[in-house]
């Protein structure tokens, strides 16, 4: 298929997905193959230019992603950087991740999608995405196309050399961004080690490194954040991965910010969501938003475990 015809198809797919209508299995396969070609050229520390709007977890809450685009501006008019966790827990993981990947393929320079800890084969089999694919497609092929694609997602991004963005947090195995650039990311998220830590770690009030209650990654204190930022010429670590009630939360004396973009998480947490706009001088402002009005929410009983909020 020539590029022009494919672009036309893509535009039609994006339009369809904007109405929360899933693509068919063959279309998903084609989309994921195209996405791999684009993502394979991206770095483990993907360079991003400002202005850009930085977003946290979305977790299959499709209507809230639509609200995010209403508040922050449509793609490609606004540049976006998403810090992972597109699937699981929400009712529309399929439509959510398909739309974000379609936008990436259509506007590769305008949207950056990083890997979260839920972009993994193992986690999606427990927290909903696998079951949703089975329910919506009658087999696991679409789940396989996406989880194979997840191995290609960049692990981190660097906005204008100063703001370091990633899903989880820092790692005792990593002192410099060059250490991250040297990792082999084309694999399932390991159970331990630097790649695991980047997607699983959390900042903590206690200094130094600590054991994470999540069972993967570490907790890291302000001393660690300050040392890392100073050593790498950074002004800020921007990350997601944790529910914060206001949608964003500063910690470590403003060395770290957490951004969470799924309002009323799991349809029951009552939190606001937020996104962080970085203008062309890297000045930041936060936009908070509440859940989109729900029409005819499917009645799905909670079958996924409560752990790992």
Swiss-Prot record:
Mn(2+) 1 binds at residues 57, 59, 85. It is found in: Cytoplasm; Nucleus; Chromosome, Centromere; Cytoplasm, Cytoskeleton, Spindle pole. Its main location: cytoplasm. Binds 2 manganese ions per subunit. The modification Leucine methyl ester is found at residue 309. It catalyses: O-phospho-L-seryl-[protein] + H2O = L-seryl-[protein] + phosphate; O-phospho-L-threonyl-[protein] + H2O = L-threonyl-[protein] + phosphate. SMART domains: PP2Ac (SM00156). Mn(2+) 2 binds at residues 85, 117, 167, 241. GO terms for molecular function: metal ion binding; protein serine/threonine phosphatase activity. GO terms for cellular component: chromosome, centromeric region; cytoplasm; cytosol; FAR/SIN/STRIPAK complex; nucleus; spindle pole. Its EC number is 3.1.3.16. One of its GO terms (biological process) is mitotic cell cycle. Keywords: Centromere, Chromosome, Cytoplasm, Cytoskeleton, Hydrolase, Manganese, Metal-binding, Methylation, Nucleus, Phosphoprotein, Protein phosphatase, Ubl conjugation. It is an enzyme of class 3 (hydrolase). The active site is at residue 118. Reversibly methyl esterified on Leu-309 by leucine carboxyl methyltransferase 1 (LCMT1) and protein phosphatase methylesterase 1 (PPME1). Carboxyl methylation influences the affinity of the catalytic subunit for the different regulatory subunits, thereby modulating the PP2A holoenzyme's substrate specificity, enzyme activity and cellular localization. CDD domains: MPP_PP2A_PP4_PP6 (cd07415). The modification Phosphotyrosine is found at residue 307. Its cofactor is Mn(2+). PANTHER family: SERINE/THREONINE-PROTEIN PHOSPHATASE PP2A-RELATED. PP2A consists of a common heterodimeric core enzyme (composed of a 36 kDa catalytic subunit (subunit C) and a 65 kDa constant regulatory subunit (PR65) (subunit A)) that associates with a variety of regulatory subunits. Proteins that associate with the core dimer include three families of regulatory subunits B (the R2/B/PR55/B55, R3/B''/PR72/PR130/PR59 and R5/B'/B56 families), the 48 kDa variable regulatory subunit, viral proteins, and cell signaling molecules. Binds PPME1. May indirectly interact with SGO1, most probably through regulatory B56 subunits. Belongs to the PPP phosphatase family. PP-1 subfamily. Catalytic subunit of protein phosphatase 2A (PP2A), a serine/threonine phosphatase involved in the regulation of a wide variety of enzymes, signal transduction pathways, and cellular events. PP2A can modulate the activity of phosphorylase B kinase, casein kinase 2, mitogen-stimulated S6 kinase, and MAP-2 kinase. Part of the striatin-interacting phosphatase and kinase (STRIPAK) complexes. STRIPAK complexes have critical roles in protein (de)phosphorylation and are regulators of multiple signaling pathways including Hippo, MAPK, nuclear receptor and cytoskeleton remodeling. This is Serine/threonine-protein phosphatase 2A catalytic subunit beta isoform. It comes from Bos taurus (Bovine).
């Amino acid at each position: 298929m020539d590029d022009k015809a494919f672009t036309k198809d893509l535009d039609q797919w994006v339009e369809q997905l904007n109405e929360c209508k899933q693509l068919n299995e063959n279309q998903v396969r084609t989309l994921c193959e195209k996405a791999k070609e684009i993502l394979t050229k991206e770095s483990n520390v993907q360079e991003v230019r400002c202005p850009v709007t930085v977003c946290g977890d979305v977790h299959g809450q499709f209507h809230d992603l639509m609200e995010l685009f209403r508040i922050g501006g449509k793609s490609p008019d606004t540049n976006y950087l998403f810090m992972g966790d597109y699937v699981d827990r929400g009712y529309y993981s399929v439509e959510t991740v398909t739309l974000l990947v379609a936008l990436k393929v259509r506007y590769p320079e305008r949207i950056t999608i990083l890997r979260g800890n839920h972009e993994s084969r193992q986690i999606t089999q427990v927290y909903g995405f696998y079951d949703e694919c089975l329910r919506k497609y009658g087999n696991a092929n679409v789940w396989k196309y996406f989880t194979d694609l997840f191995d290609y997602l960049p692990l981190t991004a660097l906005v204008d050399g100063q703001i370091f963005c990633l899903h989880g947090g820092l790692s005792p195995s990593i002192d410099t961004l060059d250490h991250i650039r040297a990792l082999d990311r084309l694999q399932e998220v390991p159970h331990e080690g630097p790649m695991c830590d980047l997607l699983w770690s959390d900042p903590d009030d206690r200094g130094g490194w600590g054991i994470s209650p999540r069972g993967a990654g570490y907790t890291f204190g302000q001393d660690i954040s300050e040392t890392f930022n100073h050593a790498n010429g950074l002004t800020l670590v921007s990350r997601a991965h944790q529910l914060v009630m206001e949608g964003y939360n500063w910690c470590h004396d403003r060395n770290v910010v957490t951004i969470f973009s799924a309002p009323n998480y799991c349809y029951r947490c009552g939190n606001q969501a937020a996104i962080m706009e970085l203008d062309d001088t890297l000045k930041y402002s936060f936009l908070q938003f509440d859940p989109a009005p729900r029409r005819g929410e499917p009645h799905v009983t909670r079958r996924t475990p409560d752990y790992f909020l």
